Amino acid sequence: LSAPFHYADFTVDPAPTRDSLIRQLNDDHVPVIGLRVTPGFMNLNGGILTEPGPPTDGHAVLLVGAARYTGPDLGVVEPGDQLMCIQNSWGTSWGANGYALIGPRAWDDMVFVSALLTPR
């Protein structure tokens, strides 16, 4: 292959945990996440996706960050909740400029696989 393409190896985790994915982020990796798309995900316009929903399809996104929520209890997001930040490929009109925060209930319901690409 010639630049900008490169060969890569990959490992698949069929049951990724938030902690294992955060360790990958801390090691400067960007995990690819397989998730079940819900109507809330499809139509996300800013904000945080907090509630699971009926799956309508599958999709892959990049996990680019994680944060622990420290604000007041909002009912759908509580202090201490771990929010996962993803980057989608659907352009800047989706989510918040192409990114979204996913709350723990939605994350646990939607995510079913991760893959980690590593250079050869």
Segments the model singles out, each with a brief description of its role:
Residues 1-87, 92-120:
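Predominantly the structural core of cysteine protease catalytic domains
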